[in-house]
Amino acid sequence: MMKLGIQMFSVKNMLMEDPIKALKAVSEVGYKYIETAVMPPQPGQKPDLGIGFGLPAAQMKQLLNDYGVKAIGSHAYYPDMEVMKARLEYQKEVGVPTIGAAASFFTDEDDVKRQCETFNKLGEMSKQLGIRFYYHNHFHEFQKMNGKTVYDIMLENTDPDLVFFELDTYWAVRAGMDPVSVMDKLGKRLIMLHQKDLPADYNLAINLFDGIIDGNESITMNTFMGLFMANPAHGQAFAEVGTGTLPIQSYIDKANELNVEYIVLEQDFTKRGELESITYSMEAFKKYKGVE
């Protein structure tokens, strides 16, 4: 049975204002497992060498203990290997067992393969400290390059003992994929799910490659952000768990079949208040079988 966690990006406004207050609020809603979000530094800032709270490791460990929360992973961006090394050492001290690439963008197949070499190196560095490295997808990893999806190229060119995956089911659907089939392909390399829902009243193409994004062009961060900033219908195409159209129980069933340990709420956008939103999803998760 999967444990329910939350990606702290779900309360991003609170997180940016006061990360410790955000952690306390999330714990009071009832979330006992968190995946942290380490934001890229602003110009002139040094990168965060921890898990996004700006605290020394010993203090971070105590804070998690005080709130009765376990950090199960972290999302981060990696400017260089030295930053990665520092973060891994921090996580080892705090007791965070996984570290993830929040996103990456790819210009062509050769670029995918080059980045896979980096992922393998990050995976090896992580493994040496008893930590697992994983990749979190959006929709663009299912773009095809020379007849294969970026995701398949990644699977073929990363070491299954070093690089694992966190499947965001929503984003897979937005690329025209069946998350259950993707989970079957991942097998034991799948270690977490990300879950949200697709609004029932969303009336544009669900598959973003169906006339919204040109799958023949390279997809950059600007492409990605521009899509959602330019059209509110895209930017607001997220719903609380259980309020939309995704067959979430089928995802839970398959993940449990594969012995996936965590299903993690990630609410990219909400029309509700952040705490109201994550509380609603918390209650909705209780209605599904196979989640505790």
Set out the residue ranges of the language-model regions.
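A short, acidic, amphipathic alpha-helical segment used as a generic capping/interface helix at domain edges
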Residues: 243-256
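Acidic/histidine-rich catalytic cores of soluble enzymes
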Residues: 126-239, 245
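Alpha-helix N-cap and loop-to-helix initiation/capping positions
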Residues: 18-21, 48-59, 83-86, 110-118, ...
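Conserved beta-strand positions
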Residues: 6-8, 36, 74, 101, ...
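Aromatic-rich peripheral "rim/lid" segments of glycoside hydrolase catalytic domains that contact
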Residues: 227, 240, 269-292
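Active-site acidic/histidine proton-transfer and metal-coordination neighborhood
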Residues: 33, 40, 70-165, 174, ...
